Amino acid sequence: MTQVAKKILVTCALPYANGSIHLGHMLEHIQADVWVRYQRMRGHEVNFICADDAHGTPIMLKAQQLGITPEQMIGEMSQEHQTDFAGFNISYDNYHSTHSDENRELSELIYTRLKENGFIKNRTISQLYDPEKGMFLPDRFVKGTCPKCKSADQYGDNCEVCGATYSPTELIEPKSVVSGATPVMRDSEHFFFDLPSFSEMLQAWTRSGALQEQVANKMQEWFESGLQQWDISRDAPYFGFEIPNAPGKYFYVWLDAPIGYMGSFKNLCDKRGDTTSFDEYWKKDSDAELYHFIGKDIVYFHSLFWPAMLEGSHFRKPTNLFVHGYVTVNGAKMSKSRGTFIKASTWLKHFDADSLRYYYTAKLSSRIDDIDLNLEDFVQRVNADIVNKVVNLASRNAGFINKRFDGVLAAELADPQLYKTFTDAAAVIGEAWESREFGKAIREIMALADVANRYVDEQAPWVVAKQEGRDADLQAICSMGINLFRVLMTYLKPVLPTLSERVEAFLNSELNWDAIEQPLLSHKVNTFKALYNRIDMKQVEALVEASKEEVKAAAAPVTGPLADFPIQETITFDDFAKIDLRVALIENAEFVDGSDKLLRLTLDLGGEKRNVFSGIRSAYPDPQALIGRQTVMVANLAPRKMRFGVSEGMVMAAGPGGKDIFLLSPDDGAKPGQQVK
């Protein structure tokens, strides 16, 4: 290790907790992981963290659709996401959630500091409101035409075509995504972050030279058009953190989402019992390095709002943003109908993780260019590079070493100068990994692989093996081939973790960047086993077909209670608190003359009797069986006069009706009159 060890904190953008991880997500997580693994190989202290972005109206509404709580949904999604990332060997030190105690505390702290420093403004705004659903519409639940570039079907907060941000009220011909209705305007008090106050600081940060040229140029466009105050609040109903001392107002998801980076790191420090690192990494004058790997669609939030929030609350700013482009498949946007919208979990059923890691890495650079996953080219490149050039180099030599020399390598290198050529390449390849010029690194490595294979071709160990008296030559040639293979795999270790583990088992030696100067001499390797299998287009065809089938299954009509009886519009806690539910003992139950649907129930509320008519006769043909049973009733429902008498409440039951009605009963131990909360 010739460099000074650095402290580095690396993050990926937080996946939203309402959907599965797909190959578009994986580009970023693979890119970051390759960079992190290289940094660790060079001896740096790296903390690699991520979390699920778990707040917002989309999560609230999807949970309602599924008939579960948002907490349950994001918990299940977190497990799925972590399983997918583990399957691709993404080496996170911690994976957390923005719906956490750490994130709440830090969000409130940053907001409070911003407010105390005069950067939070209050004002009443006119906001889009869905008259059919009775709710204010968050940015992402309004679509219309972008007011800047006039692109159609854009969300209410930013345009995915030109990258502009704006207020949903600026959209041309807006429509509610929830109901399709044309929204109306209503007034509401909102909280704003005074972004323009940080314009000078942000422009200086932009001119520092650290940012990618494309990012800096885009930021300059935003400065020229003028920074606007940023609305950081949303009205109830909303799934997120309530703003301190502002009932019914919640932090906008984009306020607490990047703070999730801090929350995840704080959670990691707490798990380790580390009471100092959080401040060391996040204090204003920290000498640790902080890097965010993000997609080009969220540059605005990370390059303007996030550093301004940190500056205004006396935390450190990012060292840099590493921005990448989108993923296309076979030259086009990922498509569910064509089977190219591929989930991470589906990929792993047909290919290993290393194959995609390699292909993405071979195409990545430090620029913000889109990456095309051409599936035919993918098969050809994996077979040509990993199998034919790298793994084949080992297999061509290992057999002779195992069979003829009991696995022991030669005591000297056959060609020390050639070996030095390979180890000297560490500087160029290392710089390519460091600067995220991944494609260049792969090209350099594969050029060396060609040289190594040419050496074996020229030395022809299969010919030497048949010649008497040349055992020493055979051992030297094959040992040289294996040592060159070892150097190549050391360079590839950040990209191919699974293959690297197999190679280390075969070599009986760890692939260590700083150890390549010393070749393996008189060293015993283990029996060679197949390291990597060829792939073919049949696997691709099966993958695409499986993706199509998943789309069909997801699009199949939903059946069951939720489909027949969709969840009603959201109510507030105050609305629910008006309903007084009580445990009631059924003292008597009888038929009602003149009605084939009703039963007359006499209910004891623990000192008060109620007469209730209930339409449950078809499900309970023997009313006497209900006597002595406890149920739950709405005790404060206004009495209703019927021709059979006055009904003084309502008993609670589940089911669609007819014979499928099921009275609700409390657990044993509940007493008549107790309130149900």
Swiss-Prot record:
One of its GO terms (molecular function) is methionine-tRNA ligase activity. InterPro entries: aa-tRNA-synth_I_CS, Anticodon_Met, Met-tRNA-synth_bsu_C, Met-tRNA_ligase_1, Met-tRNA_synth, Methionyl/Leucyl_tRNA_Synth, MetRS_core, MetRS_Zn. A motif ('HIGH' region) lies at residues 15-25. Zn(2+) binds at residues 146, 149, 159, 162. It is found in: Cytoplasm. This is Methionine--tRNA ligase. The keyword Membrane does not apply. ATP binds at residue 336. GO terms for biological process: methionyl-tRNA aminoacylation. Belongs to the class-I aminoacyl-tRNA synthetase family. MetG type 1 subfamily. It is an enzyme of class 6 (ligase). It comes from Salmonella typhi. The lineage of its organism: Bacteria, Pseudomonadati, Pseudomonadota, Gammaproteobacteria, Enterobacterales. Its cofactor is Zn(2+). Binds 1 zinc ion per subunit. Is required not only for elongation of protein synthesis but also for the initiation of all mRNA translation through initiator tRNA(fMet) aminoacylation. GO terms for cellular component: cytosol. Residues 575-677 form the tRNA-binding domain. It comes from the Bacteria.
